[in-house]
């Protein structure tokens, strides 16, 4: 959500810190918080003023009218405060319909004052600007401030100066206090703006001869502005409404939501409830809650929540297991119901999200069966058949009753089934995959009926008509938006519309091109892309079977200059970049329509976008939207989902019904409903779920009224805001004459005892007129076709449509089959429709899932088991979990081979390169390239040579004699410096460890016998570190129990031992590189006196 209430303590803390005014604000930071856990001694130590002043005490839990409810203790001593708190602190209280525990109180100094010194101040945000309310009589009995207070609208980007305050607001204020009040209100407004408040009320504001006192304060801030205000806000805590506890599970899901690009919401209404929901989509989640409440389940509804925006399988698993753990804590005598619902997704891979839910169901199958949970599933969208299949299968394998339905079933029908209001049908067979668009259109299961009921000639004529201006016939009491133009285009999109896409959204662009192709457009609708984080280049896409290139520009100016035909920009920028990029876009006169996909743009910034768009005559769709679609012409981004849904919902050609919705998921649901009950969609727009969408319901309804091809209009309204009343006024004034079907979702809100913020930021009623129930009633009285519930929406649409057909308003026309579009390889592979041999194979590592896996072991387990470098090397090199002593031995080998000074060839090369100014990788590589038979390769050779001698059965003396006879050196024997009298401590350490920990050391024993023979001839012919590592490694592989003899021999043959030296010595080489850089050594040139110049004599003469 966007606007969130904060506690009075938080509001005052921010006010005292950041308000800038010449008025003397008294009692700054004088407040103390008391909870059931408060240590009074510590509290008095932190706030010594509690002992010296009379006090006021009140609960700080978002309770309105505390004074009227007797919840304020006034003019008390500290003992009086304690006595007052005793029967209240931690006790249950009822406020209106809500019952909750009083557990957070605020103590402040008592301010003696008269009634004449009490004032009322309030600032709140609207679409047009911020209203400032002032009343000269504040306090408990202030009454209806909307009717009594002086009111001043401060427009977007306008400033409030003290003179305007005195002139418009302080009309009835005492003369001697006007200057102080004007300064304070001016500072308060600047503070409100700077810290992104959406609501700020002080009642009473007391002004005495000593200064200004802020007694009671209520406030909301725009939570989406956190990235702007974090430094000033700090870590704000958003308390739940009174009557609803704050649960750790809600905090856990909120934390998941904050870390994810997807949306994850959870509100617990009644943890003991019988009906639980897990719904995909902000709009759909409201519709399901409405339907449950309409069917009498309000007291049994346990939670409200939603997941959307393509969460990963792991995120969905975490969300699902949280809900399943909550619902399996307390039994219900009638068992429990879990509704896994959702509209038809636009871009979320349903199979991926359902696999996360299925994992959670498997993990909780025992408790689910114990609590007699029945699950009802309904979903549509990309790959939904696979999702429904895995959901059905888990029901069969676990024995949990799971009823699964797809798009053939009305979205909310499963609620009626779950609550026993309608029978559970035998499930119709569903397709095995989402590949209908592979088939010839005439034989496809998604092909519409052979006749339709709209005139193609009429629609086509309208598409190429010049843009018209909307008539400015708005209700008189609405605030007009300043516009430099007379109006905005009636026609936003045509078959020739060209767009620029901001953001590297290749999947969305490909979806748009496939839609263009299936609509038989002559050219792709995407002319270019803009992405500031890469240089100019071209991106490859498919146009039917052909490959085409679309330019990608770093700068928007270049894209606009090279594509003057573009008049639409689709903005996929993140919430942090969307405002700036949209503002930049509006500097180009060619752009007439902008779609802003991002969710989470602060409302104050959105209002600035709206103001500039109105001045420029630009239509904004969004923010927080999937976009819109005009069948046969153009679609924005991911709207309408994949091609199979485009075909199933007949979105490849225009129908006669236009719709406008807030929700992206519900707009796709409307596509489905309208295609099943009428001849199809003419145009559909999702204006977005924010409180201030760039364009409103009325903007689009007026366009549809003025568009000849549109015969009827469908509006899916929502709780929050008053836009739907403009439709009522439009009908009464005769501006709207076409039949309109409308339903406002969110009717359940009036049935809840405490306020619930739904999935959309704007879905919250701030007054009675903003409730869905009030709006539906007003629409019905105005003559709009309003169903009794969302369940009946399709029936009403069909009834109105059939009347239009019967009256000849819509004339039947022949269906035209769309062209066949091939499926993307990656999607076909995911659906299991195709296979091909892989170019590469790997058996050691898998990075594709939620966490990295080494040879079958998740990375979390690697750390949990403290496997260390040796354990990881065992997994990656040998695909084995080696014994602890083996892991330690490998690490010891890496330690002793890490370096052997700067004089050896590898280190020398590394140093030379480093001093030549080369980078780390180049220097390291030059050192590694010296490793071979003469340097470092002795590990492999020694292991092979000693193994062969040992396995052949010859005794050590025979082996030494044989090598001498053949004139070969024994690899691993001999050292330039070390000898039997000056032993190599590296060898000694390893030898002692191996003998102490290895179960058997036959090859090491053999090598030591060889050493006795060789050192008897020459003391430096010892078993060196290469030789010891080589023979000990063979002993480890053969005798640790993890390998067969064949596997052990194979690892020696393929050079595993050489890897030990390469890996170990790399550490040393890197050390030498860093050392040279740190010492700032210059280019090395070898001295002449260290080089023997041996030239041919006849040349030197």
From Swiss-Prot:
**Outcome of swapping residue 540 to R/Q:** Decreased acetylation and increased de novo lipid synthesis. Abolished ubiquitination by the BCR(KLHL25)complex
Instruction: Kindly identify the residues recorded as the active site.
Output: 760 (tele-phosphohistidine intermediate)
Annotated Low complexity bias:
441-457
Q: Which residues carry this modification: Phosphoserine?
A: 263, 451, 455, 459, 481, 663, 839, 1100
- Residues bearing the modification N6-acetyllysine: 540, 546, 554, 948, 968, 978, 1077
* Enzyme Commission code: 2.3.3.8
SMART domains (alphabetical): CoA_binding
Per the record, the domain of life is: Eukaryota
Tell me the Gene3D superfamilies matching this sequence: 3.30.470.110, Cytochrome P450-Terp, domain 2, NAD(P)-binding Rossmann-like Domain, Succinyl-CoA synthetase domains
- Residue span of region Disordered: 441-487
- Report if keyword Transferase is assigned: yes
Fetch the PANTHER family from UniProt. Answer: ATP-CITRATE SYNTHASE
* Assembly, per entry: Homotetramer.
Please identify the protein, giving its name as recorded. ATP-citrate synthase
Gene name for this UniProt entry: ACLY
């Amino acid at each position: 959500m966007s606007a969130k209430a904060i506690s009075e303590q938080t509001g005052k803390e921010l006010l005292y810190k950041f308000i800038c005014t010449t008025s003397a604000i008294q009692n700054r930071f004088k407040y103390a918080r008391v909870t059931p856990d408060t240590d009074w001694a510590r509290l008095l130590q932190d706030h010594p003023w509690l002992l010296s002043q009379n006090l006021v005490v009140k609960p700080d839990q978002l309770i309105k009218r505390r004074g009227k409810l007797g919840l304020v203790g006034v003019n008390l001593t500290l003992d009086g405060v304690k006595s007052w708190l005793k029967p209240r602190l931690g006790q249950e209280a009822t406020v209106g319909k809500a019952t909750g525990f009083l557990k957070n109180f605020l103590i402040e100094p008592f301010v003696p004052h008269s009634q004449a010194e009490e004032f009322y101040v309030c600032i709140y945000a609207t679409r047009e600007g911020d209203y400032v309310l002032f009343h000269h009589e504040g306090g408990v009995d202030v009454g209806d401030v909307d009717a009594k207070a002086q009111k001043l609208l401060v427009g977007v980007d306008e400033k409030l100066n003290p003179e305007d305050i005195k002139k418009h607001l302080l009309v009835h204020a005492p003369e001697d206090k006007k200057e102080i009040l004007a300064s304070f209100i001016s500072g308060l407004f600047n503070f409100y703006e700077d810290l992104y408040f959406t609501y700020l009320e002080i009642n009473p504001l007391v002004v005495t001869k000593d200064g200004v006192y802020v007694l009671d304060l209520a406030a909301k801030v725009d939570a989406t502005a956190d990235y702007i205000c974090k430094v000033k806000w700090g870590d704000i805590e958003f308390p739940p409404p009174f009557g609803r506890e704050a649960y750790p599970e809600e905090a856990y899901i909120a934390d998941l939501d904050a870390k994810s690009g997807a949306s994850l919401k959870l509100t617990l209404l009644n943890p003991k409830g019988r009906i639980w929901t897990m719904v995909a989509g902000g709009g759909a989640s409201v519709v399901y809650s409405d339907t449950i409440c309409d069917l009498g389940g309000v007291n049994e509804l346990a939670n409200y929540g939603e997941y959307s925006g393509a969460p990963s399988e792991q995120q969905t698993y975490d969300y699902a297991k949280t809900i399943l753990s909550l619902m399996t804590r307390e039994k219900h005598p009638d068992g429990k119901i879990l509704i896994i619902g959702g509209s038809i997704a636009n871009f979320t891979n349903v199979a991926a999200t359902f696999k996360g839910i299925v994992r959670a169901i498997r993990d909780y199958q025992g408790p689910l069966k114990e609590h007699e949970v029945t699950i009802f599933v309904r979903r549509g969208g990309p790959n939904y058949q696979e999702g429904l299949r895995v959901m059905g299968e888990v029901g069969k394998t676990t024995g949990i009753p799971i009823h699964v339905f797809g798009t053939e079933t009305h979205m909310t029908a499963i609620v009626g089934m779950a609550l026993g209001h309608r029978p559970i049908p035998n499930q119709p067979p569903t397709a095995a995959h989402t590949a209908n668009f592979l088939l010839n259109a005439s034989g496809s299961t998604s092909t519409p009926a052979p006749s339709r009921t709209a005139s193609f000639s009429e629609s086509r004529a309208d598409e190429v008509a010049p843009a018209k201006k909307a008539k400015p016939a708005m209700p008189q009491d609405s605030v007009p938006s300043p516009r430099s133009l007379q109006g905005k285009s009636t026609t936003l999109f045509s078959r020739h519309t060209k767009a620029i896409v901001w953001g590297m959204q290749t999947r969305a662009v490909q979806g748009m091109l496939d839609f263009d192709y299936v609509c038989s457009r002559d050219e792709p609708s995407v002319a270019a892309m803009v992405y500031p984080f890469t240089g100019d280049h071209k991106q490859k896409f498919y146009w039917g079977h052909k490959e085409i290139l679309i330019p990608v520009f770093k700068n928007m100016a270049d894209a606009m200059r090279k594509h003057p035909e573009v008049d639409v920009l689709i903005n996929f920028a993140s919430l942090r970049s969307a405002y700036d990029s949209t503002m930049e876009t509006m500097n180009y006169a060619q752009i007439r329509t902008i779609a802003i996909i991002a969710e989470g743009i602060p409302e104050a910034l959105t209002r600035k976008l709206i103001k500039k768009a109105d001045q420029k005559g630009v239509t904004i769709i969004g923010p927080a939207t999937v976009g819109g679609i005009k069948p046969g012409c153009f679609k924005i981004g991911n709207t309408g989902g994949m091609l199979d849904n485009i075909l199933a919902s007949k979105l490849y050609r225009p129908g006669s019904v236009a719709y406008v919705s807030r929700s992206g998921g519900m707009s796709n649901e409307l596509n489905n409903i309208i295609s099943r009950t009428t001849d199809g969609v003419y145009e559909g727009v999702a204006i977005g779920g924010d409180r201030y969408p760039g364009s409103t319901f009325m903007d689009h309804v007026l366009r549809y009224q003025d568009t000849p091809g549109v015969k009827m209009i469908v509006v899916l309204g929502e709780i929050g805001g008053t836009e739907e009343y403009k439709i009522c006024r439009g009908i009464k004034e005769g501006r709207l004459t076409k039949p309109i079907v409308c339903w406002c979702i969110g009717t359940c809100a009036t049935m809840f005892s405490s306020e619930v913020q739904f999935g959309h930021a704007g879905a919250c009623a701030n007054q009675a007129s903003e409730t869905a129930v009030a709006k539906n009633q007003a629409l019905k009285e105005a003559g709009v076709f309003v169903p009794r519930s969302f369940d009946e929406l399709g029936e009403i649409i069909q009834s109105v449509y059939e009347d239009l057909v019967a009256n000849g308003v819509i004339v039947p026309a022949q269906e035209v089959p769309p062209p066949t579009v091939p499926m993307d390889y990656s999607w076909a592979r995911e659906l299991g429709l195709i296979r091909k041999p892989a170019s590469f194979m790997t058996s050691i590592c898998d990075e594709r899932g939620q966490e990295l896996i080494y040879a079958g072991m998740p990375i979390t387990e690697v750390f949990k088991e403290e496997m260390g470098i040796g354990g990881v090397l065992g997994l990656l090199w040998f695909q084995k979990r080696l014994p602890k002593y083996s892991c330690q031995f490998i690490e010891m080998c890496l330690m002793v081979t890490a370096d052997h000074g700067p004089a050896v060839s590898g280190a020398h090369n590394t140093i030379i390169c480093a001093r030549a100014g080369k980078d780390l990788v180049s220097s390291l590589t030059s050192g590694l390239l010296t490793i071979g038979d003469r340097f470092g390769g002795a590990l492999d050779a020694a292991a092979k040579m000693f193994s062969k001698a040992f396995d052949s059965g010859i005794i050590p003396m025979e082996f030494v004699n044989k090598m001498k006879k053949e004139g070969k050196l024994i690899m691993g024997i001999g050292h330039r410096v070390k000898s039997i009298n000056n032993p190599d401590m590296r060898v000694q350490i390893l030898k002692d460890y191996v003998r102490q920990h290895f179960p058997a050391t036959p090859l090491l024993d053999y090598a030591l016998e060889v050493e006795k023979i060789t050192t008897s001839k020459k003391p430096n012919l010892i078993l060196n570190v290469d030789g010891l590592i080589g023979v000990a490694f063979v002993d480890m592989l053969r005798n640790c129990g993890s390998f067969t003899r064949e596997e052990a021999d194979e690892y020696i043959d393929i050079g595993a031992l050489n890897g030990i030296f390469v890996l170990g010595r790399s550490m040393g080489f890197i050390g030498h590189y860093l050392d040279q850089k740190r010492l700032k050594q210059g280019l090395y040139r070898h001295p002449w006196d260290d080089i023997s110049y041996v030239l041919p004599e006849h040349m030197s003469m």
